[in-house]
Structure formats: C-alpha cells, structure tokens
C-alpha cells in the first residue's frame, strides 16, 4: 500500500486577502473548511496544515487538525510543503492542497 500524507500550506500574509485562513465562513475559519473537505477523501490522521503562524496553529488545535510548524522563510506554499515533509515523510506520496 502506498504511504501518503495530505499537506495544506497556510499563512496569514497574503497580499490579496490578508488573514485568509482564519477568516470565518458560516462561523468557522476557512482553514477548517479546507481541512473538512480533505478528510472527506482522505484519512483525517493523514491530513496536515503546514504553517509558520501561531494564530493558525491555535485555530487548527481548536478543531483537532494536525499542524506542522515551518519557518517563515518559505516563499511559496510548495516551499512550505517541502519543508514540512522533508524529514518526516521521506517515503510518502505528498498531496499538496492549495
């Protein structure tokens, strides 16, 4: 069986829509809805949010969403996923959800 993980990169410093991951839609943050749709297709234990921001981490913890903290040096979502998976998921298929 193929080992896999789903990683959702998230940051608050978007120029087009600041704080996007924690903006609320129907009373819940956008990052929750992204995660919720991922767990419809994948095992929740294998879905992670990769972020450098403690506010996003706090929101994820409120909803029992797996979080991987990354450095603020990541310039793109793909960079963040690469850093998050580098040592932890070497032999896994990485599914990038952006």
PLM regions and their residue ranges:
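N-terminal glycine-rich phosphate-binding loop and ensuing alpha1 helix
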Residues: 2-50
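Short phosphate-binding loop-to-helix
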Residues: 54-98
């Amino acid at each position: 069986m193929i080992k896999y993980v789903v990683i959702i990169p998230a940051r608050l410093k978007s120029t087009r829509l600041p704080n996007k991951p924690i903006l609320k839609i129907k009373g819940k943050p956008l990052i929750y809805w992204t995660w919720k749709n991922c767990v419809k297709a994948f095992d929740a234990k294998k879905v992670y949010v990769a972020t450098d921001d403690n506010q996003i981490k706090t929101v994820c913890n409120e909803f029992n969403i797996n979080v991987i903290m990354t450095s603020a040096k990541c310039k793109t979502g793909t960079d963040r996923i690469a850093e998050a998976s580098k040592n932890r998921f070497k032999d896994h298929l990485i599914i990038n959800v952006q």
